[in-house]
């Protein structure tokens, strides 16, 4: 049975049981505590947590998921994956254990027709109710294994929250494996033989701060069945990679790389890694994740680099992953149309990123070789971090190299350096460590945001948090939750408001505002004085900063629209930062913008500012907004009701941020830089309002200084610059002539040596023009020298020139230059008769000279 049929049968089965079929949610969850959607229940987490009422009491999905915690096992084991599909059925306060168990058994035995003798069950050792249900539907007691909390009890996700026992269905593959306790093999004592195909979680408790389990008013069902595992079971194979979900991709890999699958285990591991990782790459990029050095983008980059390295291990020396994309789309595009829509774009991103990485990989591998030679096979934490930070060399690739070659890798030291860097980045960005905020999910409170209409309001303190929730604080850094607030929290690329919260006995300076869970707005800052839960306060936003941020946010919308009009509709937002001082906008585009394009975009935005257009906002249904032409952004999540920001017929986007009421308030828009973020993603940084005025004033000041230095006017300043350039050019020519005259060919010829019947000459120079040395090398060859090697020091770098007699074919100048430059921590090469290279380590020139003699002796 093919995977398409399994997927369809599952969804249709539960639809007949009264479930609503919902499409897969994005891999980017609407949850600040999660990097990716890691399970089928993630989109329903607010319902399980009691924060949101369900629209449907029963739903069923096939959810695309990403997990990278065990990435080093992918390809080496039968069932580890980064990207996978999870089939699931969910009940929100509707049916419970009996129906969940009966329907799961019915689907497996009657729809999939798996022989009952091949199935085993595990239950939580204290869950007699689940055990009795399994017995009543006919499962014999010797096929039910009672396991402890570690195996059959789910949650909570943090110290507190919903949780409950679970029961699992296992498939017996019949594989002969060792038994841990000497008894009959079962899922509790045997590794590798029994495959878990379905987990049924009964969320019936809430664990409080004391670890006590309290019964939930609304009990829920959360089940998950891995499609890849079920496909392997139905297709009679042990490895998920041998199913129809992977074989078409594996076949494309073997065709592209000209390798065979199934003959060499080491090669097979690499092929399986690539097959798994390319699926993850296609789906992540299609869902709006782009390569970067932080967050989701870093995980994407890590997956891509790992796949690229395994390609290199299979003999690939150039980008190839983009050629595998079509196989993924052909296999899964009918189920997930978003990967068809983004197919070309995904290939562009993958190609560019892989091309860059391969360039750095080769440099990194050379450095690793150098390190292990010098240290006897040890890579310390500082060296590992430098490889990562300077060359983008991932730790998992270093780990693979260490495992393959027996090197000692100091991961603990690397992690210390890495954490130092992350701490600096967090401090610079004011980032909130959401992983430490799980206790906010326990709160049954909410904050009303009033900041669209007012910048100050009276409110009441609902909660105070330091390390934990407290009733009163004095003179500390802490976090406050109010019943209502004018402070806009950091989200959607817009930075949080700053300002002050004043109480009767204290003043709280707000430094950051964020949303740890839906409906709660947290104010982070420093308190001078006292404040208590229940206090009446006055919350006031910094008006100057808010207005500057609003100018930049509306300008970002104008910029987005202008980019699409000038460059094309392929342009999509790929990230943004909207702050009071500036705006940063990342967008999808394949090439650097020309000077003319930048000028055209800037002019278009300023025209809309001068037109003084009203900026309108309206709340409507998501479907209505999209139908009306509003743009939804890649990474943003939207509820049933959305806020649409419209600037006449020029721009219309879904956006929850703060904006000016009229474009005229922006004043002036000025692009200050355009650059590359990653393959296929460009970045524009710009300023507006008073910041652009200050920028222009600085330009004018510098312009006046230039005129003063040149004793010039507006009319003749460029004429004077041209005269200066011409004068410099003439002086450079004179310097070259002087250098030529200073070089004594006869004196240099005294340094000719003979090795292995080869007349060679090695000479060091400092700061000599390269063309002068090339001419000199030609003259020395004409004087009968077989090989000329020049080391030309340029500050802390060195340029290498290698020239040989054209008829002297047993020497190859390009290969010599390549070997010597590697010692000098550089690179280069060239033709058999002439080559040029560079190096960064002038202290290794003598070592390079010794290497040259070795090369000559071996000729």
Curated annotation (Swiss-Prot):
A Gene Ontology biological process term = alanyl-tRNA aminoacylation
**Entries under Pfam families matching the protein:** DHHA1, tRNA-synt_2c, tRNA_SAD
Cysteines joined through disulfide linkages: none
At the top of the EC hierarchy, this enzyme's class is: ligase
Gene Ontology annotations for the cellular component aspect, listed alphabetically: cytosol
Keyword GTP-binding set for record: no
The record's comment on protein family reads: Belongs to the class-II aminoacyl-tRNA synthetase family.
Domain comment (free text): Consists of three domains; the N-terminal catalytic domain, the editing domain and the C-terminal C-Ala domain. The editing domain removes incorrectly charged amino acids, while the C-Ala domain, along with tRNA(Ala), serves as a bridge to cooperatively bring together the editing and aminoacylation centers thus stimulating deacylation of misacylated tRNAs.
Instruction: State what protein this is by name.
Output: Alanine--tRNA ligase
| Species, as recorded | Thermosipho melanesiensis (strain DSM 12029 / CIP 104789 / BI429)
């Amino acid at each position: 049975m093919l995977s398409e049929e399994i997927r369809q049968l599952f969804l249709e089965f539960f639809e007949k049981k009264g479930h609503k079929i919902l499409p897969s949610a994005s891999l980017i969850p609407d949850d600040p505590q999660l990097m990716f959607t890691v399970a089928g229940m993630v989109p329903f987490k607010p319902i399980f947590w009691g924060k949101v009422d369900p629209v449907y009491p029963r739903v069923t999905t096939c959810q695309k998921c990403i997990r990278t915690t065990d990435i080093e096992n992918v390809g080496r084991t039968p069932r580890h994956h980064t990207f996978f599909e999870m089939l699931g059925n969910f009940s929100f306060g509707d049916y419970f254990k009996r129906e969940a168990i009966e329907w799961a058994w019915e689907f497996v035995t009657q729809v999939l027709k798996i022989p009952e003798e091949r199935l085993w069950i595990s239950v939580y050792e204290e869950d007699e109710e689940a055990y009795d249900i399994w017995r009543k539907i006919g499962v014999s007691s010797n096929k039910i294994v009672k396991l402890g909390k570690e195996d059959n009890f789910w949650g909570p996700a943090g110290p507190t929250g919903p949780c409950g026992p679970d029961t699992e269905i296992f498939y017996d593959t019949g594989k002969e494996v060792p038994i841990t306790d000497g008894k009959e093999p079962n899922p509790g004592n045997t590794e590798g033989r029994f495959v878990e195909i379905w987990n049924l979680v009964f969320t019936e408790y809430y664990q409080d701060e004391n670890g006590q389990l309290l019964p939930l008013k609304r009990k829920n069902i959360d089940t998950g069945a891995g499609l890849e595992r079920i496909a392997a079971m139905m297709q009679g194979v042990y490895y998920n990679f041998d199913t129809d979900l992977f074989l078409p991709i594996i076949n494309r890999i073997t065709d592209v790389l000209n390798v065979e699958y199934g003959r060499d285990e080491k090669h097979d591991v690499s092929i399986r890694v690539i097959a798994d990782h390319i699926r993850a790459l296609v789906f992540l990029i299609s869902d709006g994740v782009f390569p970067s050095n932080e967050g989701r983008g870093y995980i994407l980059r890590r997956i891509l680099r790992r796949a690229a390295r395994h390609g290199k291990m299979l003999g690939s020396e150039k980008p190839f992953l983009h050629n595998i994309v079509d196989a993924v789309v052909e296999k899964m595009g009918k189920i997930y149309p978003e990967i068809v829509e983004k197919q070309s774009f995904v290939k562009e991103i993958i190609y560019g990123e892989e091309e860059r990485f391969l360039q750095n990989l080769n440099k990194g591998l050379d450095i690793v070789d150098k390190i292990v030679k010098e240290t006897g096979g040890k890579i310390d934490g500082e060296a590992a971090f430098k490889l990562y930070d300077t060359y983008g060399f991932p730790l998992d690739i270093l780990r693979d190299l260490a495992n393959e070659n027996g090197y000692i890798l100091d991961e603990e030291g690397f992690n210390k350096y890495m954490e130092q860097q992350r701490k600096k980045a967090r401090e610079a960005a004011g980032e909130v460590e959401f992983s430490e905020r799980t206790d906010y999910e326990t709160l049954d409170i909410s904050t009303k945001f009033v900041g669209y209409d007012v910048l100050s309001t009276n409110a009441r303190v609902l909660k105070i948090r330091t390390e934990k929730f407290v009733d009163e604080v004095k003179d500390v850094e802490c976090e406050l939750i109010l019943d209502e607030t004018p402070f806009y929290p950091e989200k959607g690329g817009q930075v949080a408001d700053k300002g002050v919260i004043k109480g009767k006995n204290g003043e709280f300076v707000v430094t950051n505002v964020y949303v740890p869970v839906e409906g709660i707005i947290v104010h982070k800052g420093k308190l001078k004085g006292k404040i208590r839960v229940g206090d009446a306060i006055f919350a006031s936003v910094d008006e100057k900063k808010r207005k500057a941020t609003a100018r930049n946010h509306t300008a970002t919308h104008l910029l987005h629209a202008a980019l699409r009009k000038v460059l094309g509709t392929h342009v999509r937002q790929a990230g943004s930062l909207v702050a009071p001082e500036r705006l940063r906008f990342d967008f999808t585009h394949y090439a650097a913008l020309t000077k003319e394009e930048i000028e055209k975009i800037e002019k278009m935005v300023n025209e809309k500012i001068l037109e003084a257009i009203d900026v309108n906002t309206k709340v409507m249904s998501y479907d209505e907004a999209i139908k009306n032409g509003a743009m939804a952004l890649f990474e943003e999540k939207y509820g049933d009701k959305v806020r649409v920001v419209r600037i006449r017929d020029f721009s219309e986007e879904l956006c929850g941020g703060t904006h000016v009421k009229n474009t005229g308030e922006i004043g002036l828009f000025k692009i200050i830089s355009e650059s590359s973020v990653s393959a296929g993603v460009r970045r524009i940084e710009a300023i507006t309002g008073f910041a652009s005025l200050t920028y222009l004033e600085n330009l004018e000041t510098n312009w006046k200084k230039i005129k003063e230095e040149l004793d010039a006017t507006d009319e003749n300043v460029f004429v004077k610059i041209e005269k200066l350039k011409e004068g410099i050019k003439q002086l450079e020519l004179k310097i070259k002539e002087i250098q030529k005259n200073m070089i004594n060919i006869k004196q240099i010829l005294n340094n000719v040596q003979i090795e292995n019947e080869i007349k060679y000459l090695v000479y060091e120079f400092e700061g000599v023009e390269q063309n002068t040395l090339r001419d000199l090398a030609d003259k020395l060859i004409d004087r009968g020298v077989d090989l000329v090697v020049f080391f030309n020091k340029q500050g802390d770098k060195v340029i290498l020139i290698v020239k040989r007699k054209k008829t002297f074919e047993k020497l190859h100048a390009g290969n010599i230059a390549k070997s010597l430059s590697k010692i000098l921590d550089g690179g280069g090469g060239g033709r058999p008769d002439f080559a040029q290279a560079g190096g960064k380590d002038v202290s290794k020139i003598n070592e390079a000279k010794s290497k040259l003699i070795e090369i000559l002796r071996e000729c």
